[in-house]
From Swiss-Prot:
Record location of the Glycyl lysine isopeptide (Lys-Gly) (interchain with G-Cter in SUMO) cross-link: 732, 774
Subcellular location, principal: nucleus
Region (Interaction with CREBBP): 781-988
Function: Nuclear receptor coactivator that directly binds nuclear receptors and stimulates the transcriptional activities in a hormone-dependent fashion. Involved in the coactivation of different nuclear receptors, such as for steroids (PGR, GR and ER), retinoids (RXRs), thyroid hormone (TRs) and prostanoids (PPARs). Also involved in coactivation mediated by STAT3, STAT5A, STAT5B and STAT6 transcription factors. Displays histone acetyltransferase activity toward H3 and H4; the relevance of such activity remains however unclear.
Organism name: Homo sapiens (Human)
UniProt-recorded name of the protein: Nuclear receptor coactivator 1
SMART domains registered for this protein in UniProt: DUF1518, HLH, PAS
Motif range (LXXLL motif 5): 749-753
Length: 1441
């Protein structure tokens, strides 16, 4: 300041001023001015600094004077100094708050960066112009997994997705080259950009490198970049122009809650003709059915005085073409209040023959009272409108297609829009694979086009699936539609729509409208060609594939959804090729898809013939759930196998699940083509499914499902099923089969039951809407195939099996059969071998002889037998048949029965198995089968318990048994100790010898030691003794057989099963026919030659219709139930009576009587035999044992069988008949069976089936108690016959197997009911086990003989349950109990027929089963089975059965 004044203001130097003149003055003034300005500037800065202090703001609010500013500055400086001093001295925290804001920030630079990065939720990195990362923040690890050091000085491109390199370069060096050329001068300003890029996540195995293609996992990052054009000098480093980036995870879009929506299609009267709930299903929410019901109800409810929205929209849409409703509310059952709005559009199908229809999209809004109807729903609803003028007549399905008429782009737009909008999603999801609406389903917008189409498709599908379906049928008419119609949204699950999310947009042909068929539209949308998932209703595909393949590209949907979609029963997919006028394969595929969808959607949950959801059927939630699960399971099972077969057959040109639909031929394409390889599920999976199915499902479900696929097959091209698939997959059901099946099955069943064998023979093919099953016969797999072995070489053999449409019969049995069937189907060879080994391998059986049902059941074994012509069963007796029938029914059939008897067989009995089990037509095939069977038997025989158990576990048999699906016929009866011979009073000669093991020795060693062979004289009841018949003597007169020591050929269980089955068939066919006594070939059971007549009889008869079988099964089930009750009652009574009852002679009217009361005695035996026939004490009927027939040496074979039978069966019979039958009868029965079995040593023994012969089919009406009910024929004969026969059957493995083997040919239901026999073979031997499988076969489902049935009660495991009076008496209660204990597995209720279930408890049957000498063909396996047979694996038992 002094300087300023020095020169200018110095008064002492005025002269000097003047001397200097103006130039000096000017200079001085300019300098002072500058200084003044500078001073002012500093003061201003001070003021600013001070003003930063809140305390100074007031003072600085007005422009301060210099003095004040300076003063304040001084004060501030002093304050700062004072504070610093205080801080250093006191370091008081409170003082910190007083620190001036002008001081350094509270946040240090070091901590500020991390805080900012944390706030940004990203990491910071700097990239130089060369693309190298010169700096990266440490928190990059939490984002990309790389360490800071790993990325420093590395190329940024190493962590960028290749597709994002260009974008990054553009942002990094917008105006420079990567080589570091200096930034242009104009680029001096900083440029900021925000873009998204994919950054590589650090692979777990190795540090980030430039090539991480193997484990390329990228995270989408949002990068905010600032270019720093000027070089930056920091810490001595000169950073050239660089890009400063902050990368943060792309904010995850709020989870788009898929708009819940469903679509309805209404006809031009306002009636709902279909409902597409695929979108809701795909969403996976529970309660969607209720939602649909309530929403539709609210939509159709009048709004106060106003008409319902449905009516309003209907009127508007009919006039304007489109309409949308305001939001309306409804409350779900759980109290949730939802709002919804509906958009409707009038659609004109392309096809002029189709009527216009109204597509409505109902969008549910859970969050708001409702979307504005105009919201997305518009897009969703904006199905490309076809001008109303366009083919107004187009069918609704086409209507669906109509949207396709829009340029594909439009439809895509619409669909896409819809997809985007969750509500539209409904459409898109349903139509466009519900890809978007599925939301997560992953449909690309392109697929949404499909959605559009799909929307139409939903309509189309409903229509297309069954042109016949009257969409209009829906009861809902006009707005008055009742909820019920929409009620059953049926598991339309995705009618394939939801599942199709994957369709590429292009899959939709540009011009969807071109699709002529309603389905076509959808399908075009799903164009198979695109391999994207074709629109074929996923459900149908799934149903077909049902296996692993979720039919849909959208795996998102739960398996349940998938199953649900598959639930639409495949049969529903009867695609009518005509319906699908496919312009090209794509169209066809789309049409098929659509049809399937429509079917699926309409009958999703339940197969609806109409296939339309509109059906009033409401699925109650429970029902729907149940049906979903069971249907899903059943379908899963059926479709998996079916699919696999189909897939193989079709060659599944579409390897892609998605493309699965493609390639298949039009209609059939969807059914067969639809199935994808993915459907192949492992056997284990299938077993699991079966177990679940058995637990949850009902036979009807299974039947329906099984039939439906069959129908699909037939409707579509008949697909020759390669193999193991379940019978249904194999079965081609004619489309009309379902219509006729119910009544026809019953008629056929009755027909078969009542029809003589001859008649049957004459009409081998029943008009059961025969299901032609092309089963490529698989050669038997090695016996050891525990795994469902792939079918062995299939010897293609076509068998027409009556479609067993429904096996509603015994669910338990059916369930038991199912898993086995499943296995059998899968391992037909296995099953076959099992059956084969036990039975006469060489026995040639003409399936004709067998009733259709038997045929189906024994088809395979029979075929095997047929294959084994060398084994002729000369000795085959018609144990059941009347004289004529005996000839017709060779024991071969019995043998087949025996074979079938094995559990496998029984299980195989299910038509599916039967279909699969068509006998090989060629000798080679038969031989192969025989060889395989033998191998299997030998293999199993060689296994120890643990190995067998492992096999069982591997096959899931143990689970089946545990689940109660199968009662394993383990040797239920430990080798029975010699039971006190049931003393038929008259029978002085009880054969005390237990059944000998199958040893051919004439004398039946007493494997049933407890069983005394009864002499021919049967107690009080005289038994007509028919001379041993060398051949089937027409006269059934049964001579008491002398105890001929027929070498008991080891009866093959299979043979026994076959025999039983044959017998059952014969009985069924010839219930009225007297059992003709056939001599068994005296010697080698295997050597048994069938009479030519027998062989002819063997000619395959048309298998029973599936429905017939189902009916039988139902009857059988009821019978079983009654039997179980009776057995329990009897058991209790017998237990009480047992103490004395066992010892009582059969005639003593011991608890046996109990059995009798249960058994209706009223019906005299169908056999002409006089009541006394078998009962004549003096002459036990010739051995009635069916086994004897098989046995070359009737006596030997009988001896074994008879003793078994006598003990187990006769005792049982006695018990059963005892009351109903005179004590004489009972005695006779015992005697007779004993005598017949033992006494009739004659080779003829088997043929001479005394009425008492258990093998002889007794026409006895089914006992009211299924087991005990078998009414003993009024005539004493009948019961004895039954008893004897059973004894014989038991005694003879063949016989028994015959009884069992006689497949439940439709016999009189009563017979079957009666036939349901639990045969307890009391024998000393544990061999009974083997017997048991035989006995299981023996389950006389097929057997006509009530006596057999009567025996069944006897067979009851619990001796108490068994009638002790006769056979039971013979069998010591101890034996029975033992057998029961041993035979927990032994007793296996096998459903030979649906109608008949025999629980055969072989008591001491082991000898017979184990008889080393198979009845000729009996495999060593049966022989090997000894008491340890009880321990034998379930598998082995199943096989033996």
């Amino acid at each position: 300041m002094s300087g300023l004044g020095d020169s200018s203001s110095d008064p002492a130097n005025p002269d000097s001023h003047k001397r200097k003149g103006s130039p000096c003055d000017t200079l001085a003034s300019s300098t002072e001015k500058r200084r003044r300005e500078q001073e002012n500037k500093y003061l201003e800065e001070l003021a600013e600094l001070l003003s930063a202090n809140i305390s100074d703001i007031d003072s600085l609010s007005v422009k301060p004077d210099k003095c004040k500013i300076l003063k304040k500055t001084v004060d501030q400086i002093q304050l700062m100094k004072r504070m610093e001093q205080e801080k250093s001295t006191t370091d008081d925290d409170v003082q910190k708050s007083d620190i001036s804001s002008s001081s350094q920030g509270v946040i240090e630079k070091e901590s500020l960066g991390p805080l900012l990065l944390e706030a940004l939720d990203g990491f910071f990195f700097v990239v130089n112009c060369e693309g190298r990362i010169v700096f990266v923040s440490e928190n990059v690890t939490s984002y990309l997994g790389y360490n800071q050091e790993e990325l420093m000085n590395t190329s940024v491109y190493s962590i960028l997705h290749v597709g994002d390199h260009a974008e990054f370069v553009k942002n990094l060096l917008p105006k420079s080259l990567v080589n570091g050329v200096p930034w242009p001068q104009e680029a001096t300003r900083r440029n900021s950009h925000t873009f998204n890029c994919r950054m590589l996540i650090h692979p777990p195995d190795e540090p980030g490198t430039e090539n991480q293609e193997a484990c390329q996992r990228y995270e989408v990052m949002q990068c905010f970049t600032v270019s720093q054009p000027k070089s930056i000098q920091e810490d001595g480093e000169d950073f050239q122009s660089c890009l400063i980036c902050i990368a943060r995870r792309l904010p995850r879009p709020p989870a788009i809650t898929g708009v819940e929506s469903f679509m309805t299609k209404q006809d031009t009267t306002g009636k709902i003709i279909s409902i597409d709930t695929s979108s809701l299903r795909a969403a996976g929410r529970t309660g969607w059915e209720d939602l649909v019901r309530k929403c539709i109800y609210a939509f159709f409810q009048p709004q106060g005085r106003e008409p319902s929205y449905a009516r309003q929209l209907f009127q508007e849409v009919m006039t304007r073409g489109t309409a949308s409703s305001p939001s309306y509310r409804f409350i779900l059952n759980d109290g949730t209040m939802l709002s919804a709005h509906t958009k409707c559009k009038l659609c004109y199908p392309q096809s002029p023959d189709m009527q216009p229809f109204i597509m409505g999209i109902h969008i549910i809004d859970r969050e708001h009272s409702g979307l504005s109807p105009q919201d997305d729903t518009n897009s969703g609803m904006s199905i490309p409108r076809v001008n109303p003028s366009v083919n107004p007549s187009i069918s609704p399905a086409h209507g669906v297609a109509r949207s396709s008429t829009l340029p594909p782009s439009n439809s895509n737009m619409v669909s896409t829009r819809i997809n985007r909008q969750q509500s539209s999603d409904l459409h898109s999801s349903s139509h466009s694979n519900s890809s978007n609406s599925q939301g997560s389903f992953g449909c690309s917008p392109g697929s949404q086009i499909v959605a559009n189409v799909a929307l139409n498709q939903g309509q189309a599908s409903s229509q297309s699936s069954n042109p016949s379906l009257n969409l209009n049928n829906s009861p809902m008419e006009g707005t008055g539609i009742s909820l019920a119609q929409f009620m059953s949204p049926r598991r339309q699950v995705t009618s394939g729509l939801a599942t199709r999310p994957r369709m590429p947009n292009n899959s939709f042909p540009p011009n969807i409208s071109t699709l002529s068929s309603p389905v076509g539209m959808t399908s075009s949308a799903c164009n198979n060609n695109n391999r994207s998932y074709s629109n074929i209703p996923v459900t149908s595909l799934q149903g077909m594939n049902e296996g692993p393949n979720n039919s849909v590209g959208f795996s998102a949907s739960s398996p349940v959804l998938r199953q649900m979609s598959s639930q639409n029963s495949p049969s529903r997919l009867n695609i009518q090729p005509a319906k699908a006028e496919s312009k090209d394969n794509k169209e066809i595929a789309s049409i098929l898809n659509e049809m399937i969808q429509s079917d699926n959607s309409s009958s999703d949950g339940k197969p609806l013939d109409s296939g339309l959801l509109h059906n009033n059927d409401r699925l109650s939630d429970g029902d729907s759930k149940y049906s979903q699960t069971s249907h899903k399971l059943v379908q899963l099972l059926t479709t998996t196998a079916e699919q696999q077969l189909r897939h193989a057959d079709i060659d599944t040109s579409c390897k892609d699940v998605l493309s699965c639909t493609g390639t298949s031929n039009s209609a059939s394409a969807n059914s067969s083509g639809g199935s994808c390889p993915s459907s192949h599920s492992s056997l284990t999976e299938r077993h699991k499914i079966l177990h679940r199915l058995l637990q949850e499902g009902s036979p009807s479900d299974i039947t329906t499902l099984s039939v439906e696929p069959d129908k699909k097959d037939s409707a579509s091209t008949s697909v020759s099923v390669t193999g193991q698939v379940q019978g249904n997959s194999s079965i081609k059901l004619e489309l009309d089969a379902s219509k006729k099946k119910e009544s026809k099955d019953h008629q056929l069943l009755r027909y078969l039951l009542d029809k003589d064998e001859k008649d049957l023979r004459s009409t081998p093919n029943l008009s059961l809407d025969d299901v032609k099953v092309k089963v490529e016969k698989k050669e038997q797999m090695d016996p050891c195939n525990t795994n469902p072995t792939p079918m062995t070489k299939p010897t293609p053999e076509e068998i027409k099996l009556e479609a067993q449409s429904q096996f509603t019969a015994d669910l338990d049995q059916f369930d038991q059969l199912l898993p086995t069937l499943e296995k059998a189907a899968q391992l037909p060879g296995l099953c076959e071998t099992d059956r084969m080994d036990g039975a006469v391998t060489s026995v040639t059986i003409k399936s004709e002889i067998l009733p259709a049902s038997l045929q189906s059941a024994t088809a395979r074994p029979t075929s095997r037998l047929n294959r084994l012509p060398e084994l002729e069963l000369e000795a085959i007796d018609n144990q059941f048949g009347q004289p004529g029938t005996g000839d017709q029914i060779p024991w071969t059939n019995n043998t087949v029965t025996a074979i079938n008897q094995s559990k496998s067989e029984d299980q195989c009995i299910s038509s599916q198995l039967d279909e699969l089990l068509c006998p090989p037509t060629t000798v080679e095939g038969r031989n192969d089968e025989k060889a395989l069977l033998e191998q299997l038997v030998s293999f199993l025989s060689g296994k120890d318990e643990t190995e067998l158990a492992e096999l069982d576990r591997a096959l899931g048999i143990d689970k089946l048994v545990q689940g109660g699906g199968l009662d394993v016929l383990s040797e239920r009866f430990p080798p029975q100790q010699a039971t006190p011979p049931l003393i038929m009073e008259e029978r002085p000669n009880l054969y005390s010898q237990p059944y000998s093991s199958p040893s051919p020795t004439a004398n039946l060693p007493s494997p049933f030691q407890g069983m005394v062979r009864q002499k021919p004289s049967l107690g009080t009841m005289p038994v007509q003794v028919t001379p041993p018949r060398g051949a089937f003597s027409p006269g059934m007169g049964m001579q008491p057989r002398q105890t001929l020591n027929r070498p008991p050929a080891a009866p093959n269980q299979l043979r026994l099963q076959l025999q039983q089955r044959l017998q059952g068939q014969q009985q069924l066919i010839h219930q009225n026919r007297q059992a003709i006594l056939n001599q068994f070939a005296a010697t080698a059971p295997v050597g048994i030659n069938m009479r030519s007549g027998m062989q002819q009889q063997i000619t395959p008869q048309p298998p029973l219709n599936a429905q017939m079988l189902a009916q039988r099964q139902r009857e059988l089930y009821s019978q079983q139930h009654r039997q179980r009750q009776l057995i329990q009652q009897q058991r209790a009574m017998l237990m009480r009576q047992q103490s004395f009852g066992n010892n009582l002679p059969p005639s003593s009217g011991l608890p046996v009587q109990m059995g009798n009361p249960r058994l209706p005695q009223g019906a005299p035996q169908q056999f002409p035999y006089p009541p006394n026939y078998g009962t004549n004490p003096g002459t036990p009927p010739a051995s009635t044992s069916p086994f004897s027939q098989l046995a070359a040496n009737p006596e030997a074979s009988l001896a074994n069988r008879n003793s078994m039978v006598s003990r187990g069966m006769t005792g049982n019979i006695g018990g059963q008949f005892g009351t109903g039958i005179n004590p004489q009868m009972q005695q006779n029965v015992f005697q007779y069976p004993g005598a017949g079995m033992v006494p009739q040593g004659e080779a003829n023994f088997a043929p001479s089936l005394s009425p008492g012969s258990s093998m002889v089919p007794m026409p006895i009406p089914p006992p009211q108690s299924s087991l005990l009910q078998q009414t003993p024929p009024a005539s004493g004969y009948q019961s004895p016959d039954m008893k004897a026969w059973q004894q014989g059957a038991i005694g003879n493995n063949n016989v028994f197997s015959q009884a069992v083997q006689n497949q439940p040919t439709p016999a009189q239901p009563g017979v079957y009911n009666n036939m349901s026999i639990t045969v307890s073979m009391a024998g000393g031997n544990t061999n009974v086990q083997n017997m048991n499988p035989m006995m299981a076969q023996m389950q006389m489902s097929s057997l006509q003989m009530p006596g057999m049935n009567t025996v069944c009660p006897e067979q009851i495991n619990d001796p108490a349950l068994r009638h002790t009076g006769l056979y039971c008496n013979q069998l010591s209660s101890t034996d029975l109990l033992k057998t029961e204990a041993d035979g927990t597995q032994q007793v296996q209720q096998v459903q030979v027929f649906a109608d008949v279930q025999c629980t055969v408890n072989l008591v001491g049957g082991d000898p017979y089963l184990n008889q080393p000498g198979p009845l000729g063909t009996q495999k060593p396996t049966s022989g090997p089975q000894t008491p340890q047979a009880q321990q034998k694996s379930l598998l082995q038992q199943l096989l033996t059965e």
